[in-house]
Amino acid sequence: MLSIFGRATFAKATAPLGKALVSTGLTPDAVTLIGTAASIAAAVTLFPTGHLFWGTMVIWLFVMFDMLDGAMARARGGGTRYGAVLDATCDRVADGAIFGGLAWWAVYHEQSKPLFVATLVVLVTSQVISYAKARAEASGLSADGGLIERPDRLVIVLVGAGLTGIGGYWGIEWLIWAVHVAMWILAVLSIVTVAQRVLAVRSSPGAREILGASNSGTEQPS
């Protein structure tokens, strides 16, 4: 949802920053790698040790930094196919680290099985949501839309984790449950989004055509 309503505004707001970064000689791919590496480092060190607030702050900072690669690409006149693949791949790895770090905290620090289950569901479905779209597009079909995409997931999980961190520092009991609520909301919305994307593929033109034996569409192991 945020991807639809906020993309144009974000692109316009970050255009000057993109031009400034390009003038330094930094490349969009370098920004992608730096932002991803820093987000992963924060997720696997701060979240598992219970530093949810500071983990949220660091991850949010570098997620915003990582998003500047698009502004830089536009400032240079366009991106590359390699850059698009690198960005998408790094996003999946960063998401895995964020939800993996939270899952570790849920098990070994919070000792909450329900929170672990919700986080695990989100970890899996977040990858499936992105994969379904990529696989559909590779087959010439459409899997756009759905209730929740990556920007939505990041906002919900980071707000929840940040509020829980604040609740822990200040002893505000009800705030401590923020990440629990956030993860269950994400789990439900992510499952719905997976179903929406599969149905979108099913209703795409040509989706029900019978393929020949030599082009069965069976995915080969990678």
PLM features: residue spans?
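Hydrophobic, well-structured mid-protein blocks that either form specific transmembrane helices
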Residues: M64-S112
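Hydrophobic alpha-helical transmembrane segments
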Residues: M1-V58, V63, I98-S222
